[in-house]
Amino acid sequence: MENSLKSSGKPPAAPKVGMVSLGCPKALVDSEQIITQLRAEGYEISGTYDGADLVVVNTCGFIDEAVQESLDAIGEALAENGKVIVTGCLGAKKSASGSGLIEEVHPKVLAVTGPHAVGEVMQVVHSHLPKPHDPFVDLVPAAGIKLTPRHYAYLKISEGCNHRCSFCIIPSMRGDLVSRPVAEVMLEAENLFKAGVKELLVISQDTSAYGVDVKYRTGFWNGRPLKTRMTELVGALGELAAQYGAWVRLHYVYPYPHVDEIIPMMAQGPLKGHVLPYLDVPFQHAHPDVLKRMKRPANAEKVLERVQRWREICPDLTIRSTFIAGFPGETEAQFETLLDFIREAELDRVGCFAYSPVEGASANELDGALPDDVREARRARFMEVAEEVSAARIERKVGKTLKVLIDEVNEEGGIGRTAADAPEIDGVVYVEPAAKASKRYKVGDFVSVKITGADGHDLWGEV
């Protein structure tokens, strides 16, 4: 029998999946892993709703505003495309009736999973949009698909958290701490550096607790033993970064005793300039009574002593932190204690939230809830003090020559960051255009910049 079907000579078009990623850097890494797996299996990634065969929405459910943003994004994806898979923290949230919140608000979604559920997401994708073919080994780069610029990337070392802070519901959505195998983390870091990443941002819910869940089990990397522990991991990442002339930046660092072991790496020896003198430490408050209600470590005096000791060892250390103003039961005197702490600690970069009740958080049961206007007024007063402190510290950099990583180049010059500035949350350096061809720079370059001015948050300088 003659076959009447003739080949067009072109392979069938690959199915396309759209991706909407909301929330924190940890959620962004989840999205990157999903996209990486999709590309590995031959799917294409669509940048538009109408160009996609279905859409995956990675949600955030930490605070009420984030919940609403996620629900709105799901609704938009349903309206524009119609086929939507939902993943992320909001997927683990229940409504007042006890059923899934997303399914109750948007019953037409194809499926809902919780956070860090790449396998589950892929199973649902397969059931609604079969994968086109078995992938070639080199279809996706070893570093995976990233949503960040090529010169920096986030490295997530664990999932979940063992803390039970009264204002937070993350453990109920992401579970208890689960540390990634240390060799797996190191391999990902190496692949990222090989791909041209100049700055690796180490993230998790609690970076300092890395390895606690596996009792600091010893793994192996490049034929040598390596403990699944923060200190050893940071040292190994610093050594790897030094080979590629890159930076390692630490986020979500709780001030456990062994953090003291990290500071010398930042200040001296072969890792100086690679393990950045930068710590993102979420202190949240300074008054012991408020910290106890938050179910947080409650000794601000010891924290001040350690901050001072860290700076004695590493004078260039930048400390970023976040705080909550207007927590239930917070008195004016307790708030003043917080302001005094900010002045004395001289933190470089600070963020502050007016307390907002989060559905499911135990803090909702505390007495002494403050009116919205009081909470917001305290947040504003806090930021006024914090910005004065930050501006004074930034002003000291004028006249110095600093190493800057270029993030953007335009007609007016470049925009970059120093070791003291994490992307998107800290300040930037506006760099004058290079006058000589020998001094021209591009995105991802490290350049030496003489700082000529400061405005309280950002810096200006010339190559």
Curated annotation (Swiss-Prot):
Gene Ontology CC: one annotated term: cytosol
Cofactor note: Binds 2 [4Fe-4S] clusters. One cluster is coordinated with 3 cysteines and an exchangeable S-adenosyl-L-methionine.
Entry's Gene Ontology BP terms: tRNA modification
Catalysed reactions, semicolon-separated: L-aspartate(89)-[ribosomal protein uS12]-hydrogen + (sulfur carrier)-SH + AH2 + 2 S-adenosyl-L-methionine = 3-methylsulfanyl-L-aspartate(89)-[ribosomal protein uS12]-hydrogen + (sulfur carrier)-H + 5'-deoxyadenosine + L-methionine + A + S-adenosyl-L-homocysteine + 2 H(+)
Domain TRAM: 395-463
Database matches in InterPro entries: Elp3/MiaA/NifB-like_rSAM, Methylthiotransferase, Methylthiotransferase_CS, Methylthiotransferase_N, Methylthiotransferase_N_sf, NA-bd_OB-fold, Ribosomal_uS12_MeSTrfase_RimO, rSAM
Domain MTTase N-terminal: 15-130
Keywords: 4Fe-4S, Cytoplasm, Iron, Iron-sulfur, Metal-binding, S-adenosyl-L-methionine, Transferase
Subcellular location as annotated: Cytoplasm
GO molecular-function terms, A-Z: 4 iron, 4 sulfur cluster binding; aspartic acid methylthiotransferase activity; metal ion binding; protein methylthiotransferase activity
Named cofactor requirement(s): [4Fe-4S] cluster
Span of domain Radical SAM core: 147-392
EC number from the UniProt entry: 2.8.4.4
Broadest EC class assigned to this enzyme: transferase
Record-linked SMART domains: Elp3
Residues that, per the record, bind [4Fe-4S] cluster 1: 24, 60, 89
Residues the entry annotates as binding [4Fe-4S] cluster 2: 161, 165, 168
Family of the protein in this entry: Belongs to the methylthiotransferase family. RimO subfamily.
Cited function: Catalyzes the methylthiolation of an aspartic acid residue of ribosomal protein uS12.
Protein name in the entry: Ribosomal protein uS12 methylthiotransferase RimO
Designated gene of the protein: rimO
